[in-house]
């Protein structure tokens, strides 16, 4: 069955218009007029029509009447429920809402109400239906009072709902920014009641005593007056703004409507649209007049029909009041009671009407851009202000500082963690090492007991080795003693002289002092010698130098300079030493040379540690010296014997040295013998020395000499054998030492000391001279010193020469002693250059 929608809409509009008229007539109309005027100023047309505040009468019933019949017989049950706060600021857009449009001050995307019509054929059969508290039961227009009375009588005490309206709880929210305005909020219902009767059980008695109504009206008026005073103050402030806003919105709406776009409803004709536009224009001219034209500001309604499968659901109409934060659903139930006859039956249809909410109107180009989904380019103008740059730099510094602080904290944290880890590792290692130490100590104690026996055995072995070594040393010593005994047997004549050498140092020191006196006298009183004269011209006997020891020629410029031994007549063989002869007759000159340590070279026997120079003076002096006595003959015989013994001893020593090499200190402990010969032949006798690594500066002085005897220089035995040497009284020794008044018998040490001597480190030379050679045997015998004396001199040696006396008669010797030149007849005279 088709429904006449135009008639039904007209009925609703007339009912709304009558509501406003009744509000103006009663005492509550003053406040409602103001609210109604505000509602007409809204930009949403449908919202202005259906969101007006509901004014309740004194009996809490709606005064809607049409042809003396009540349209709505139920009460508005208003409940300020806080649970509906989640519905605030719900800006959900409708299908016809303009995209990307922000809600205005009075328009927050509130959906348009829904008009739902129910078929009442099934309502009588349903006895237990849940009725919302905020639902409005709409009875049929032709229903009479009898049906209402029956429904009231059939309703139980539980179905009867008293007036729950509290005027103080009204919240007037016409103005969005002000929550203090008392406005009746139509919220969604929460409390539901079950009825045992049909839909007529939801109706409430409309008849209330007139006295009660008057009292309620007076109370409402008093409360409304207080509220009006507050509203007037707020509305006066914002009324001007609202009017301007509404005027601008209306103009934009007119410009945005394109006549080419079909905005008409399928159920509405062109006349309805024209009426809407006319009503919109009338609101802009006279918004506050409560005329009938303002009541017909109908919105553009589009209705859609849903499927009939939802026939069991109640048809409802959503009536949304003028509250931007809440949405209330008002269900209008329509019951057809035509005198108990269900003559009019209508199908259940749902009409979903949505209204386009115009909030922020856009131009055609903007709408096309939005429809095309083109991105909007926003240009941000660059700022070149110094303040902005400073702020940016400041922020960068702050960011860097924070980053650095964070990094430092992280590093510190990591460092601390590493330290803790190392500490834990070290403690673990320490504990493990302690355990190992204890274990090793136990092993040491165990092994100590086991090794005690082995140590004792090793000590015994060492003692046995020491005993064997001592035995070997004793055997060697016995061999040496045997050699000494053999030497003693061969040299019986020299026993007396060896015993005299073992005198104490004090006696030697006294003899040295005495000889020093005589030697100095002889040196100072010696006359100068010419190149053509000899000592024989001065004294009754001739004296001439025989050797110039440790001198070098001027022609040698190479770094390796060899030592030469010069004499007036004879030189050594080529195989013995590298020598360079010197002219026999030279003037007294001084030459300064450096003597290296390798001045002497032995080409024949380089591996031997002993240098043996045996000069055998076996020449007979019978042709030259006929006046020699028996003493000279005896001396020759003794010299020959000594030479033979020395050769034998040297051969034995070489063999022992090859078998048992001794230390360097033993090898260097040597001395030189100077043997006088009675022969008249002349020869050279070099002194041999082991020089050190250093050099000394020497000067050679030559004098005119006569033909002396050639001494025989031979190497003596070691120091161990020197203690009791078998030397003849005629033999002479050169003994030297590094420190004064200490006599040395080592020829190697003597030679090195001679070469290394300088002004800061002078050398001390001690001469062990026989008394007979100095003709002092009588004086020495008178003193009781023996046949020999010692001369000790501390000096820097630059040149050494050995003077050998000529063979003279004993008679002449006694007369020469007091002479000034008697010291020149000494067996060995050292001339020193200071």
From Swiss-Prot:
Residues 391-454 form the bZIP domain. Residues 83-160, 378-405, 455-504, 550-712 are annotated as: Disordered. Residues 393-402 are annotated as: Basic motif. Disulfide bonds: none annotated. Its main location: nucleus. GO terms for biological process: regulation of gene expression. InterPro entries: bZIP, bZIP_sf. Signal peptide: none annotated. It comes from the Eukaryota. Residues 90-111, 550-595 have a biased composition (Polar residues). SUPFAM superfamilies: Leucine zipper domain (SSF57959). GO terms for cellular component: nucleus. Residues 119-157, 616-651, 694-707 have a biased composition (Low complexity). It is found in: Nucleus. SMART domains: BRLZ (SM00338). GO terms for molecular function: DNA-binding transcription factor activity; sequence-specific DNA binding. Keywords: Coiled coil, DNA-binding, Nucleus, Transcription, Transcription regulation. Residues 211-246 form a coiled coil. Pfam families: bZIP_1. Belongs to the bZIP family. Probable transcriptional regulator. This is Probable basic-leucine zipper transcription factor D.
